Curated annotation (Swiss-Prot):
Residues involved in Mg(2+) 2 binding: D96
Protein name: Sesquiterpene synthase MAN_10655
Keywords of the record: Lyase, Magnesium, Metal-binding
Function: Terpene synthase that catalyzes the conversion of (2E,6E)-farnesyl diphosphate (FPP) into sesquiterpenes which are important for fungi-environment interactions. Produces a mixture consisting of 9 sesquiterpenes including gamma-cadinene, delta-cadinene, alpha-cadinene, alpha-cadinol, beta-elemene, (E)-beta-caryophyllene, germacrene D, gamma-muurolene and an unidentified oxygen-containing sesquiterpene.
GO terms for biological process, alphabetical: isoprenoid biosynthetic process
Motif mapping: DDXXXD motif: 91-96
EC class: lyase
Positions annotated to bind Mg(2+) 1: D91, D96
EC numbers on record: 4.2.3.-
Transmembrane segments: none
Binding site for Mg(2+) 3: N230, S234, E238
Gene Ontology molecular function, alphabetical: metal ion binding; terpene synthase activity
């Protein structure tokens, strides 16, 4: 009933554009990174059918990496692109585009946490686990220990707050905006992404800099801007998902607003958050701060602008013409693990060479 009421308002929906006062950036390695990312996804059996492969091709995750990390070294940029294609596919297949909860949900998510905690895969591995181990081992080699742990903690919170998101969708009505924002802040996967912003620019910041209160406010604002804008931009496809479909816009609609008014309310919040980010970033960078911290704050800006440009110029992830085919992944939700097992030994050998 809730979904049907929302779907009835989609045909006339107007989605706003967002802008920020700093220029577009993109690595000149974007196309190479995209091609290598597709090859890597193939080698790790992430592209479960030709239909799914075509979806990934038109989504352009390598371009997202190139826009959000324009100054990253070649090796780091590639592992980030590989991480992004892995994350979007796993998030869709484990959480968003399948039933709210399945028999495999707990096993799948705990396997991802175990890779972070134990630095090994299970036997047998779940879908995507060997690819995830490969990403983590490459990042461990490229990042300082504490910097990797920031990334890892963000991913642990993604896996664990997914359970809160599932609980919210098992309720007859959604939790409030405040509770939703807490869940969204971590299920988005933005914290692992922003944790790489320093290494991808001018080098790792010290822990005392990263955890500075103003810096953490900038990180949260970056997270909010991307997540809340995405709640608007992905609204049409998310409403058609069989499992997770509630977001900031639908919660405002649940409170009595029309869907268009709910979009405008969310958009106003995005624009206010952009203004607050700009004010704090300008004030903070006017201080005597380290070269690396300047690079980190630049990296947050790259993520905001890079994501917004990716949605407008590159990706078809949220395109209307693919809603019917892309919103429901239940037919892909239990990929044949024999695909993984057939290549398990070769992938494991290539992974070991990275340690």
């Amino acid at each position: 009933m809730e979904k049907q009421r929302l779907k009835a308002q989609l045909s006339s929906l107007r989605v706003p554009l967002f802008s920020v006062p700093w220029p577009e950036q993109c690595s000149n390695k974007a196309e190479v990174v995209e091609a290598r990312m597709m090859k890597w996804a193939d080698e790790h059996n992430l592209l479960v059918t030709d239909e799914y492969r075509n979806r990934v091709i038109r989504t352009r995750y390598g371009l997202l990496a190139a826009r959000c990390y324009p100054n990253a070294g070649d090796e780091l940029l590639q592992v980030i692109a590989d991480y992004l294609v892995w994350f979007f596919l796993i998030d869709d297949l484990f959480v968003d585009c399948v039933e709210v909860a399945t028999d495999e949900t707990i096993r799948n998510l705990t396997a991802m946490v175990d890779v972070l905690d134990l630095n090994v895969s299970g036997s047998p591995p779940v879908f995507g686990e060997l690819a995830w181990l490969d990403v983590c081992q490459r990042l461990r080699r490229l990042l300082q220990v504490e910097a990797f742990e920031r990334f890892a903690q963000g991913m642990r919170l993604w896996a664990t707050t997914a359970a809160l998101q599932i609980l919210n969708h098992l309720r007859p009505t959604s939790v409030s905006i405040r509770e939703y924002q807490t869940i969204r802040r971590h299920t988005s996967g933005m914290n692992p992404c922003t944790s790489l912003a320093d290494a991808a620019n001018k080098g790792s910041v010290q822990a005392c800099e990263f955890y500075n209160a103003d810096v953490q406010t900038l990180v949260r604002q970056t997270n909010n801007i991307v997540c809340w804008a995405n709640d608007i931009q992905s609204l049409r496809i998310e409403i058609h998902q069989p499992g997770q479909f509630r977001n900031m816009v639908t919660i405002y609609a649940q409170q009595g607003q029309s869907l268009q008014d709910a979009v405008e309310t969310a958009a106003t919040r995005v624009n206010k958050e952009i203004a607050s980010f700009c004010e704090l970033a300008n004030a903070f960078t006017a201080r005597d701060i380290s070269h690396e911290l300047h690079g980190f704050i630049d990296g947050l800006k790259y993520w905001i602008r890079g994501y917004l440009d990716w949605v407008v110029h590159d990706t078809l992830r949220y395109a209307d013409q693919f809603i019917e085919s892309d919103a429901d992944d239940r037919r892909f939700s239990a990929p044949d693990l024999s695909l993984l097992n057939n290549s398990c030994s070769s992938v494991t050998e290539s992974t070991r060479s990275l340690v």
